[in-house]
Regions:
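Conserved alpha/beta-hydrolase catalytic His-Asp/Glu region
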Residues: 106, 110-114, 124-184
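Active-site loop/oxyanion-hole signature of alpha/beta-hydrolase fold enzymes
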Residues: 18, 28-76, 237
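Short beta-strand/loop motif that positions the catalytic acidic residue
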Residues: 185, 191-193, 197
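The conserved beta1-alpha1 loop
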Residues: 1-5, 193
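Conserved alpha/beta-hydrolase "acid-adjacent" motif
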Residues: 198-204
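Flexible "cap/lid" loop of the alpha/beta hydrolase fold
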Residues: 82-87, 91-128
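Active-site glycine-rich loops that stabilize anionic/oxyanionic intermediates
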Residues: 5-8, 75
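Catalytic active-site module of serine/aspartate enzymes centered on a nucleophile-bearing elbow/loop
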Residues: 214-243
Length: 243
């Protein structure tokens, strides 16, 4: 099961998925408010925290009659998958986290990468200028400035997301703090961390690894927050070796 990150959709996995289709049953989906999802299904109360999105993951697994799922989550989906596995551990065989962050906000000795005021400023800009926010953030998130087409694709993905849902999901994503949940996760986990990532720095990947005794950390020689787009080969190889 492949789960996309904020502002994206299932199409973002297109360079990775073909390597698994012959051997595994592959499940792709869009979270409510993303991609081609049914926007009428959005419930502000249900999706006021990441647990609502985790409940959707569990519902999909149950509806399809799956078990022993390998959950591969990018960015915020890493924590969504963790919450789902904590709630229903028997459904999950293993988890792959790509660029995970349990909290984006610095707190004492914990370095999440952003000050609270930084996050508040980003959210305010998103509220006031969705297109401008997308144009500013896409190159930062994607990295790889020598390949501007990658940032352009991410910007287009941000821009086609419904602004109301984008603003809501951004708040839930960037203001969540799931550090205390990590110790509850006992599912075998692979953490794929880019050596340079402006959104989830190396220190965060190392923190997640320390908190998860059943985890393996691979620091890839890659930049940016979306290696499944910028470096799909190494991502695919790491996942295959793990599962």
């Amino acid at each position: 099961m492949f789960a996309h990150g904020y502002g994206c959709d299932q199409n973002m996995w297109r360079a990775v998925v073909p390597s698994f289709e012959d051997e595994y049953r592959v499940v792709l989906f869009d979270y409510v408010g993303s991609g081609l999802s049914d926007l009428s299904s959005f419930n502000r109360t249900r999706y006021s925290s990441l647990t609502g999105y985790a409940a959707d993951v569990i519902e999909i697994i149950e509806e399809l009659g799956l078990d022993r799922v390998t959950f591969i989550g990018h960015s915020v989906s890493s924590m969504i998958g963790a919450l789902a596995a904590i709630e229903r551990p028997k459904l999950f065989e293993q988890i792959v986290m790509i660029g995970p962050s349990p909290s984006y906000i610095n707190d004492g000795d914990y370095v999440g990468g952003f000050g609270r005021s930084d996050i508040e400023d980003l959210l305010e800009m998103l509220d006031n200028n969705h297109a401008g926010w997308s144009a500013m953030m896409a190159p930062i998130i994607m990295g790889n400035p020598d390949r501007p087409e990658l940032a352009a694709e991410l910007e287009a993905s941000f821009c086609k997301t419904d602004p109301v849902h984008a603003q809501h999901f951004a708040r839930v994503t960037f203001l969540s703090d799931n550090r205390s949940d990590l110790v509850k996760l006992h599912t075998r986990t692979l953490i794929l961390q880019c050596a340079e990532d402006a959104i989830a720095p190396l220190s965060v990947g190392q923190y997640v690894h320390r908190c998860l005794p059943e985890s393996q950390l691979i620091v890839m020689d890659a930049t940016g927050h979306c290696p499944h787009l910028s470096s799909p080969g190494p991502v695919t190889d790491a996942i295959r070796a793990f599962i």
